[in-house]
Amino acid sequence: MDFSQFILPEFPEYYIYPTGQIYSIRNKKYLKPRFDKDGYERFSIKNVLTNKIQTIKTHQLVAMKYLNHNNTNGLVVDHIDNNKLNNAVHNLQLLSPLQNTLKYCYSKVQKNGLPSCITYKIKKKIYVFKLKTPECVYNYECKNLLDCIEKKNEIFKKIVKGKLN
């Protein structure tokens, strides 16, 4: 088998497998990931382009190798099944920051069963409010940001009174 297919040019000392495993060619062993404060796997590996040790998340490495992701294209790497530990290429996709935020909003549910964000559309821009209080996700046409904030407050009052429809 030709293992060169698993190498990224900037990290030639490592095999990056489609499963998300990272293998050190020099040390002849799989690297053990560490975890960042948000629960993502990460590795500290040498980047030959900068000649420095770089800490990088596993899903970003896999996306760089198999999805042609670079940090300059404005896209973010998303876990399709929302499992931060499933870094297999078939579970990763590239999304715009807005798409990623909206996916998060509509997929995450608070302990009370309600969504965790609210979105507002003002002209052609969409504003997303992450909620720490119980509010539902709605899409509103707003005249301006102040109008959106007022509508957000109206929704909150209705929820508190138990009259949301």
Predicted regions mapped to residue ranges:
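Conserved recognition-core residues within compact binding domains
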Residues: 1-76, 83-164
